[in-house]
Amino acid sequence: MKVSLFVTCLVDMFQTNVGKATVELLERLGCEVDFPEGQICCGQPAYNSGYVHDAKKAMKRMIETFQDSEYVVSPSGSCTTMFREYPHLFQDDPKWADKAKKLADKTYELTDFIVNVLGVEDVGATLHTKATLHTSCHMTRLLGVRKEPMKLLSHVKGLQFTELPGKHNCCGFGGTFSVKMAQISEQMVDEKVECVEETGAEVLIGADCGCLMNIGGRLGRKDKNVKVMHIAEVLNSR
């Protein structure tokens, strides 16, 4: 099965280890992975800030970049959600409507792809630690990927898991929200940090780098000894 990696901006710029883990994991599961070098931002930050015209320029670039891909897989529920929104945004554009739908239909968040396309729940991972899981807003509320991460994590050997209190609450990142509404964002992430502490976890797992950077940064500033790991890194642990 051929898979094109949609790496996302945050992974490409700040968390390249997540991209590497994603590729290694997919290859171990029998996928042939390529990386279309024409990919840029999915357009979400510009779109959410109201710059629809500018956002669509990026979206068209991404549609063209992945037009020949069999499957597109991303280690981000948030950015995958943006791809799934393309058909709605281009529905009145005869030139791009069909292309946008084709891209949306073949694009998957990593855990969704592993469980529901590859049909795998045990990837053979081992990680001896105490952990909890933060579920991102876009991934659960908009993309509808809720059970897949835990289906995979439940098979990780050595992983002692505790459910995160208030797991459905936003961490306060929200892309530009954390900049435009910094004080509110700070209060939200402080609440999330308190919930993480309650679990006694040594590792906080997440599926979106934006959330992990936000919560991880706050944990660091408060001198909390909790490591953050993307779920791709956990599932790639041997």
Swiss-Prot record:
User: Which terms does the record give in the GO molecular function aspect?
Assistant: oxidoreductase activity
- GO CC annotation: cytosol
> According to the record, what induces this protein's expression?
Is under the dual control of the transcriptional repressors LutR and SinR, which allows the lutABC operon to be induced during both growth in liquid culture and biofilm formation. Is induced by L-lactate, which relieves LutR repression.
| Highest taxon above the source species | Bacteria
- For this protein, the parts annotated as crossing the membrane are none
Q: Which residues form the signal peptide?
A: none
A Gene Ontology BP annotation from the UniProt entry: lactate metabolic process
Q: Pfam families given for it?
A: CCG
Phenotype caused by lack of the gene? Cells lacking this gene are unable to grow on minimal medium with L-lactate as the sole carbon source. Cells lacking the lutABC operon exhibit little or no defect in biofilm formation on MSgg medium, but form small colonies that almost completely lacked surface architecture when glycerol is replaced with L-lactate in the MSgg medium.
Functional summary from the UniProt entry: Is essential for L-lactate degradation and allows cells to grow with lactate as the sole carbon source. May also allow cells to utilize an alternative carbon source during biofilm formation, since it contributes to the formation of architecturally complex communities when lactate is present.
Q: Report the family membership.
A: Belongs to the LutA/YkgE family.
Q: What is this protein called?
A: Lactate utilization protein A
Organism for this UniProt entry: Bacillus subtilis (strain 168)
